[in-house]
């Protein structure tokens, strides 16, 4: 079993974080949001001064018509189109999801302008054919069609679909009050293209690698490796540290020992002399097995080959 971790003075870290945040005065671009899609080291960071909200086709009567009829899939009809979302104030669209895309055109009207700043077929948000809406940030898997490409706006955004109908839809956005946000304009520098390519490579990595995320606040990671043999009823401490820091990755190679329905090997962890476990789960459950077999292989958690991995910091 391999544990990737870092040890560092957390007080200094907090001071550095505050200083960087306080002195930033540049406009917030879509690429500032894009870089967060690979900044796994920042997952534990609390966000303040923003609000995550969503437009969706949920049944306003709390029934089961969450998009089947299309009755709740838009806010209003306007000039022959359907207004499906309308956001006031600075913000960023983080996610668009649907299981039922169509080829109707979408128009994104930014900052109260009468002409759209972005026009694209609804289906091309997910097809991977239109830059920068490329795979794997945009695509379709079990569960529907998704787009995680950030779309920023300085003052407002209205999304209008041309056509008569729409079914299931979710549009998730984050309001950024008081921030100087640069509106997405569809122009891209060489640096923008390079960053997008780097994020796409991180999302599509063929093999999990903890050191790929040992950057930023997770840089300087060390590795602790231990081999254990467990008999029924036994337990073994595989990692222990008496200094502040963070675990940046857990890799556990157990062959096929965790397969099957028994789920009788338990992983536990606790921090800071707590009397209660922060983690207490069957190994199989922790790494995403289902019905006794490996069932998950994501960027941050799952199983690849015989390696069970978790890179949540």
Give the residues covered by each predicted segment.
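Bacterial N-terminal signal peptides that target proteins for export
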Residues: 1-10
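Hydrophobic h-region of N-terminal signal peptides that target proteins for export
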Residues: 13-23
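Beta-strand-centric surfaces of beta-sandwich/beta-rich domains
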Residues: 23-313
């Amino acid at each position: 079993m391999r544990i990737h971790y870092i040890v560092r003075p957390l007080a200094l870290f907090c001071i550095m974080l505050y200083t960087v945040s306080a002195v930033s005065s540049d406009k917030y671009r879509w690429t500032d949001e894009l870089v967060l899609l690979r900044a796994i080291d920042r997952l534990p960071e609390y966000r303040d001064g923003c609000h995550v909200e969503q437009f969706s086709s949920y049944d306003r009567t709390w029934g089961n018509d969450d998009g089947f009829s299309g009755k709740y899939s838009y806010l209003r009809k306007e000039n022959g189109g359907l207004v499906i979302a309308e956001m006031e104030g600075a913000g960023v669209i983080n996610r668009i999801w649907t299981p039922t895309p169509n080829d109707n055109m979408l128009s994104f009207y930014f900052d109260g302008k009468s002409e759209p700043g972005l026009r694209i077929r609804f289906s091309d948000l997910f097809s991977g054919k239109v830059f920068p809406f490329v795979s794997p940030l945009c695509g379709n898997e079990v569960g529907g069609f998704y787009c995680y490409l950030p779309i920023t706006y300085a003052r407002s955004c209205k999304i209008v679909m041309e056509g008569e109908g729409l079914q299931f839809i979710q549009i998730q956005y984050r309001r950024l009050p008081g921030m100087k946000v640069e509106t997405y304009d569809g122009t891209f520098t060489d640096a923008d293209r390079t960053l997008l390519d780097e994020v796409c490579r991180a999302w599509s990595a063929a093999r999990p690698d903890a050191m790929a995320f040992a950057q930023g606040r997770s840089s300087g990671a060390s590795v602790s490796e231990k081999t254990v043999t467990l008999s029924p009823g036994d337990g073994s401490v595989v990692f222990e540290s008496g200094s502040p820091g963070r675990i940046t990755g857990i890799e556990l190679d157990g062959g096929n020992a965790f397969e099957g329905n028994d789920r009788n090997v338990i992983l536990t962890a606790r921090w800071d002399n707590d009397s209660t476990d922060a983690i207490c789960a069957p190994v199989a459950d922790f790494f995403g097995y289902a019905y006794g077999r490996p069932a998950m292989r994501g960027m941050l958690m799952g199983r690849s080959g015989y390696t069970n991995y978790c890179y949540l910091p």
